[in-house]
Regions:
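Active-site mouth loops of central-metabolism enzymes
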Residues: 1-2
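Active-site-proximal helices and loops of the catalytic beta/alpha 8
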Residues: 7-16, 21-132, 144-148, 154-159, ...
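Active-site neighborhood of divalent metal-dependent phosphoester/pyrophosphate hydrolases
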Residues: 133-140
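Short secondary-structure junctions and interdomain/linker hinges
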Residues: 139, 160-163
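Acidic/polar loop patches that form or flank catalytic/metal-binding clefts of enzymes
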Residues: 163-169
Length: 177
């Protein structure tokens, strides 16, 4: 595991990569990600120190977003495996992909925005989520027929958190083949 951490942190140290998106996070022990974040934080600090002319914001920390399949903002900081509960935010992640959004998008703007704002400012202070409406990992997207593209875009782009645009979301590309 340390070989891979070294390899990935070398990209940070050499090129100034400021964040990673990690796929299938829950298939590895959670403490691995805490160690990985520490290694990347150190590499990013070294890059900034050695390349002050390339630094866009000296106070921005290294960013990690994780795909914990099934995690939703409604769980706040906890992902429940059934036999154990894990806080991935305390184990190296700045953000997690929010699998709740595609269902929450059926709610009113006010309901989505108020709820997400409350959770992000009370339960996830200093952390965030990445919302999506469609994904290659998910067979139950919001607006599968693409009849509500403006509503999808508005809710996705204005909801508190980060917006993940899946190829075709921006053009209304067909999801049903």
């Amino acid at each position: 595991k340390y070989y891979i951490m070294k390899w990935l942190s070398d990209y940070v140290r050499e090129f100034g990569i400021d964040g990673y998106r990690v796929d299938t996070v829950k298939h590895t022990n959670e403490d691995v990600w805490k160690d990985f974040k520490k290694v990347c934080d150190q590499a990013f600090a070294e890059f900034k120190l050695n390349n002050p002319d390339k630094v866009l914001d000296k106070n921005t920390p290294f960013f990690t977003v994780g795909e914990v399949y099934g995690y939703g903002i409604s769980g706040k900081q906890i992902y429940d495996f059934g036999d154990k509960k894990v806080n991935y935010f305390q184990n190296g992640f700045t953000s997690l992909i929010n699998f709740d959004f595609k269902g929450d998008a059926n709610k009113s703007y006010e309901e989505i925005f108020s709820n997400y704002d409350k959770i992000l400012h009370q339960d996830l202070t200093g952390k965030t989520v990445m919302n999506y409406a469609t994904s290659h990992d998910d067979g139950w997207p919001f607006d599968k027929e693409r009849k509500r593209t403006y509503e999808t875009a508005t809710k996705l782009l204005l909801a508190p958190g980060i917006s993940q645009i899946y190829y075709g979301d921006e053009t209304g590309r067909k999801l049903i083949i």
